[in-house]
Amino acid sequence: MNHIYIIEDDSVLCSELALALEAVGYHTTCANDFNNLLNEFLLVSPDLVILDINLPNTDGFILCMKIRKVSQVPIIFITGRDSQIDELQALSLGGDDYITKPYSLPVLM
């Protein structure tokens, strides 16, 4: 697993996360086209997805369901939403893990 697709609409946070992951040997791609995330996912063909819930034009729950229809790639939700209901929903829709912001990079790694 070396290619990680980061779907985070906060460009600063996405860049910081990408740099941290690249520093330990991962290749990363930050989402660019929030109108066509599924198509971008298919083009990127990642080994892992890091997915926020609150996104422009969609939400991470819906995108997770769409990804699950075409791929079994691991999906880690990283979000500021810390309710147990959101965590349960994320995992029941196909997410593999759920981490709340602010998060610790060692925990993520």
Residue map of PLM features:
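N-terminal/domain-start alpha-helical segments
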Residues: 1-109
